Structure formats: C-alpha cells, structure tokens
Amino acid sequence: MGGANGKSGLRVWRNARLATMADGVAGLGIVEKGAIATRDGLIIYAGAEASMPALAGPGAETVDCEGRWITPGLIDCHTHLVYAGNRANEFEMRLAGATYEEVARAGGGIVSSVKSLRAANEDELVAQTLPRLDALMAEGVTTVEVKSGYGLDLDNEKKSLRAARRLANERPVTIRTTCLAAHALPPEAKGDKEAFVDLVAGTILPGVAAEKLADAVDGFCEGIAFSPEQIARVFDKARALGLPVKLHADQLSNLHGAALAASYGALSADHLEYTDEAGAAAMAKAGTVATILPGAYYFIRETKKPPVDLFRRHGVKMAVATDSNPGTSPLTSLLLTMNMAATLFGLTVDECLAGVTREAARALGLLDKTGTLEAGKSADLAIWDIERPAELVYRMGFNPLHARIWRGQ
C-alpha cells in the first residue's frame, strides 16, 4: 500500500469500469472502458481509456484492472471511533428488558464510556481504536471522521482528539476530527447543564482550538442532552474560533435541530428521524448535508425513520455513515451500513453509493479534495471484484474489495 506520505510518480489503472460519482452527473457517473492516472498522490485523469492523453513516460507504472470496478475510496463521515472498553453488558441488560433509564441508573450509558475513556491513556486509546479503523479500511474506506465526546473535560477531550489524530500516523488513511464536548453531562456537572455549557464554550473549545486538534465542532441537541439555546452558545463560540459545525439533531424528538444546524450553515445535521418539512427546507437552503445513520436506528430499535422523501423533495444531499460507537451503533462495516440504509430507509443504490463517497466528502467539507474520481482530487480509490456497483449495497457480510488506494499508494 506504500508509505504514509502517499507520494509517487505516474501510475495508471486501465481496463477498468469507473463509477466516478462526479457532482452534477446523472447516476454514478459510469465510464465502461475507463482509466485513471495519478501522480504525486493526485488524480490527473479519470475517464474513457481511449481519450486518455499520452501521459506515460519512463518509470510509469500501469495496472491492468481486468474489467474490475473502481469507485472513490469510501468515506465514513460520522464515527465515535475513539473509546475505551465496550458496553456489551448494557446490550445484555436491554435484551433482558431493562429500559434506557434503568441502564443509566446502573452506571451505563454515555457516562460509562466517559469513565472508561478517562481511565485510559492516549496510547491505550490508540491501541483499542486501531482494530476498529482496520475493519473500516478493509472495506475500502480511505477517510474517517472521528468525534470526541467521551472526555467531557478539557484534558480528556484533548486526549481523545490527539488519539484520533495519531491514527493517521499509524495507518494510510485521512482522519478528520470533530470536538463533540457538548455530548452529555459528566458526573461532576451534577445536572447543571448551563454551567457545563459555560465550560464547553469558555474552556474546552478554546483549549482544543489553540492546539488545532479539531477540524469541526459538533453537539447533541436532544431532551436528554442539550437544548437548542445551549447548542447555539456552543456554535457561537465555534464560529468565533473559525471552526465549522455539525449537529446530532432530531434523533429522538423534534427540537428543530435541523433548522438550528442550517441557521449556522452546518456542514451536516445527523440522525434526523424527527426532522420536519421546515427543517428539510432550511437544510436545503443552507446546503447542509443530511447524514443518515441506520446502525443506531437498528441497534436501539427505533421506529421513526428519517424523512428521506422530504430530503429528496427539497434537494437535501444525503450522506450515509456507521455512527460507530460503543453504546448505540457498535458497527464497523460501511458496506453493511449501505444495505441497512437501502433496506430500512428506502435509499436507492445510487443514493447509498453517493452517500459514502461524494456526499460524505461534502458532509466533511472535503468535496474539493476527495469523494469523486476527478482530476485534481486525492487519488483515493477502491477497486472491487463485482459485476455491478449494486452488489456493494446488496450483499451482506461479504467484502469484494480487491485493492484500496490512498493518495495514489
């Protein structure tokens, strides 16, 4: 797979079928007899092999793809990948009939993950996270967003984000970090949400920003978490620090989180099961991506589905992600996630594939760099042993990845 710097001379992948996922092109942007040329980690040509300019010089490396399909490298745009321990015991309690409240009273829930993360050092966090990252990468994932949110004080949020950043030194992958300090109340807050929001906006975000540990700021807007007014204070501080925002919105109730996210020009609003028409319209106007998370819906047995038809009608772009986390979506397969999005929520194959490539890149503010097979983008590719792209969504528990290329290597 090459070194972590991802630099190389000219490489050409020929005799391939391409799903370019180019923006503004119908469907998957398919090129039947295609080729891709890369240099210095960037795509310099993607299109019909017959139309490829004469690029080859001495030392050019050519790969015969033997008719395989090439898509952009997959992107998981919403994960909580860095955590310690697991919550399998809560899973057993819930199967035995315990309610969410009973689990929380027994010391479970997000607070359980906070306790575990605080007890672990940075090296331990990296070591525990790498197998989860490897599982994603084994399915052709080349970019992963990783949130904090189990530290909930300055030192532990920084530890979590530093561990996430270190993943990119350990593996050939692009990592985007998001500070989700406004995730839950830590035990020491003793139920005082206002004081904790003061801490997030006044201390945690500035401290994280000073060390450039976060690419974005997120929050959890929900009755069991933070109110729209509290999230607005967090987002005002993020804006002052020059950081883009994202939001866990309308998952368990409609607090108009989607509209709140849109009012701040959020990159994405995520979950969205209870989003209404006004929220969808606001997102469309703001260009905020709807990130669909079927893993959590499945795992906690939700019954209210995100309003996919509303998003289509208003032209809201949809991304699809694992929401990989220890409590509500212990999922590290983006391929299975696509199948869930199609089966549970009715997304089309084209929507699913766009959702883990182009629209996932858009949800991270990276569409100018990755997410499609176009000249000038990072040479992040996934090469598949399949007859047609629909197989990537249709099959379950099957991985047809032939090769994964990150920055040309």
UniProtKB/Swiss-Prot annotation:
Stored Gene3D superfamilies: Metal-dependent hydrolases, Urease, subunit C, domain 1
Top-rank taxon: Bacteria
Coiled-coil regions listed in the entry: none
Cofactor note: Binds 1 zinc or iron ion per subunit.
Cofactor: Zn(2+); Fe(3+)
Binding site for N-formimidoyl-L-glutamate: Y150, N325, G327
Protein's cellular compartments: Cytoplasm
Residues the entry annotates as binding Zn(2+): H78, H80, H248, D323
Keyword terms of this UniProt record: Cytoplasm, Histidine metabolism, Hydrolase, Iron, Metal-binding, Zinc
GO term, biological process aspect, one: L-histidine catabolic process to glutamate and formate
Residues the entry annotates as binding 4-imidazolone-5-propanoate: R87, Y150, H183, Q251, T328
Keyword Iron (UniProt): yes
Enzyme Commission number(s): 3.5.2.7
Gene Ontology CC entries for this record: cytoplasm
Catalytic reaction list: 4-imidazolone-5-propanoate + H2O = N-formimidoyl-L-glutamate
Pathway, per record: Amino-acid degradation; L-histidine degradation into L-glutamate; N-formimidoyl-L-glutamate from L-histidine: step 3/3
Positions with a binding annotation for Fe(3+): H78, H80, H248, D323
GO molecular function, one term: imidazolonepropionase activity
Main location: cytoplasm
Biological role stated in the UniProt entry: Catalyzes the hydrolytic cleavage of the carbon-nitrogen bond in imidazolone-5-propanoate to yield N-formimidoyl-L-glutamate. It is the third step in the universal histidine degradation pathway.
Similarity-based family: Belongs to the metallo-dependent hydrolases superfamily. HutI family.
Family matches, as HAMAP family: HutI
Record's protein name: Imidazolonepropionase
UniProt source species: Mesorhizobium japonicum (strain LMG 29417 / CECT 9101 / MAFF 303099) (Mesorhizobium loti (strain MAFF 303099))
Gene that encodes it: hutI
